[in-house]
UniProtKB/Swiss-Prot annotation:
GO molecular function, one term: identical protein binding
Subunit structure: Homodimer.
Name of the featured protein: D-cysteine desulfhydrase 1, mitochondrial
Species lineage: Eukaryota, Viridiplantae, Streptophyta, Embryophyta, Tracheophyta
Gene: DCD1
Ways its activity is controlled: Inhibited by L-cysteine (L-cys).
InterPro entries hit by this protein: ACCD_DCysDesulf (IPR027278), D-Cys_desShydrase (IPR005966), TrpB-like_PALP (IPR001926), TrpB-like_PALP_sf (IPR036052)
Native source organism of the sequence: Oryza sativa subsp. japonica (Rice)
Modified residue annotations for N6-(pyridoxal phosphate)lysine: K119
Top-rank taxon, per record: Eukaryota
């Protein structure tokens, strides 16, 4: 869909301005007052030609930070257009909310198809830096069904770079073909080079040393590798969600009648919550950020987020910016039957499909906390950030099969007369 303006089904206005990073695009599928809608529509129409310019997608462009983040350094000077932004915000009619509580959802799961989810925002800055440094390939590390690794593989091929992935799996599978399930299918289709390590090897050596080993090997072969950390989470990648806060700010300005008290998001590597928390504090948003960690523990993430904030030469403190709660359950990428049933029930009730590794656990943790501490959430407007990861569901097919919708053989009588449709097949 072009980044212009149209009236969506149900009387919602979706308005988008030119996708320049210095003047961020606007989009909010929220009912607008008539005058505001008309003004926003005119602005969208005037910008539509620039937004829909052939070749603007996948292009590199100059970047200037939001005014409220201009003191942070180092600040990126360029970014790639890799995602379909702005992503919409709409009301999420979750069941059993506390009195007066509203939950809205930021749909970063639809920032693209092969290249979707929260990792795209980080990669827009990281890939621009890789190209600026003259890289001809990128290296990154993750789990066997890593959304970040899949997004990195696709983004690299978009801009003509090779991609090397170090994927963590069980010691029983490390010497076997990893297959074509979920994210692996996309990674292998786009030609990513995959090296497997066991969880034990990963724990002993660590992601940084593993990436350095592969980098050294590639340098010896005459390649020019650029290392992207786990989840794209470093100080440069943090700018992805600082920029997302500017996007949300503009969407709120267009709406004129929605203000968010809280932002809720999953946390798996720390960069997304660092950008959201820092941006929310510095901008006009001022929403409290609540992160539900799906691995490690809150203490680790507070320390890591603090390192990212320090890396941008800010004197703000992680504990003042974000509340981090443990939602890892059985462990990273592992689910209880109750968690998977929750994912299925939410999809059935609202049409929103959550991934089982990140947003599914975050939403589960959020609603569980609302049930246990309703007064904490009563009367508040919450923005839940859906970070994508839909392909991760394919790794849970066996576990979900007993929970999925029923089917039946259609009961037909032999006497039913034929009526031809369109085409020979019908």
């Amino acid at each position: 869909m072009a980044r212009g303006a149209h009236q969506a089904p149900g009387g919602f206005w979706t308005v988008a301005a030119a996708p320049t990073r210095c003047s961020l695009p606007h989009s909010l599928p929220i009912p607008l007052h008539a005058a505001a809608a008309a003004a926003a529509w005119m602005a969208g129409v005037s910008a539509a030609s620039a937004a829909g310019k052939i070749g603007s997608f996948l292009s590199k462009r100059p970047y200037a930070p939001p005014s409220w983040a201009s003191h942070l350094s180092p600040a990126p000077s360029q970014t790639f257009s890799l995602g379909h932004f702005p992503t919409p915000i709409h009301k999420w009619n979750l069941p059993n909310l506390p009195n007066g509580t509203e939950v809205w959802i930021k749909r970063d799961d639809i920032s693209g198809m092969q290249l979707s989810g929260n990792k795209v925002r980080k990669l827009e800055f990281l890939m621009a830096d890789a190209v600026a440094q003259g890289a001809d390939c990128v290296i990154t590390v993750g789990g066997i069904q890593s959304n970040h690794c899949r997004a990195t593989a696709v983004a690299a091929k978009y801009i003509n770079l090779d991609c090397y992935l170090i994927l963590r799996t069980s010691k029983l599978l490390v010497d076997k073909d990893p297959g074509l399930v979920g994210n692996l299918l996309v990674e292998r289709l786009v030609g990513a080079h995959i090296d497997l390590v066991s969880k034990e090897e990963y724990g002993k050596i660590g992601s940084v040393a593993l990436a350095d080993l592969l980098k050294k090997k590639l340098l010896e072969e005459g390649r020019k590798p650029y290392v992207i950390p786990v989840g794209g989470s470093n100080s440069l990648g943090t700018w992805g969600y600082i920029e997302a806060i500017r996007e949300i700010e503009h969407q709120i300005q267009i709406s004129g009648d929605v203000q968010f008290d809280d932002i809720v998001v999953a946390c798996g590597s720390g960069g997304t919550i660092a950008g959201l928390a820092l941006g929310s504090k510095l901008s006009s948003l001022k929403a409290k950020v609540h992160a539900f960690s799906v691995c490690d523990d809150p203490g680790y993430f507070h320390s890591y987020v603090q390192d990212l904030i320090d890396g941008l030469h800010s004197d703000l403190r992680s504990h003042d910016l974000v509340n981090i709660e443990n939602a890892k359950g059985l462990g990273y990428a592992m689910n209880t039957a109750e968690e998977l049933k929750f994912v299925k029930d939410i999809a059935t009730a609202t049409g929103i499909v959550l991934d089982p590794v990140y947003s599914g656990k975050a939403a589960y943790g959020m609603l569980k906390d609302m049930g246990a501490n309703p007064a904490k959430w009563e009367g508040r407007k919450i923005l839940f950030v859906h970070t994508g990861g839909l392909l991760g569901l394919y790794d849970k097919v066996d576990e979900l099969s007993s929970l999925s919708g029923s089917w039946r053989r259609m009961d037909l009588e032999e006497s039913v007369p034929r009526k031809d449709g369109t085409g020979k097949m019908f």
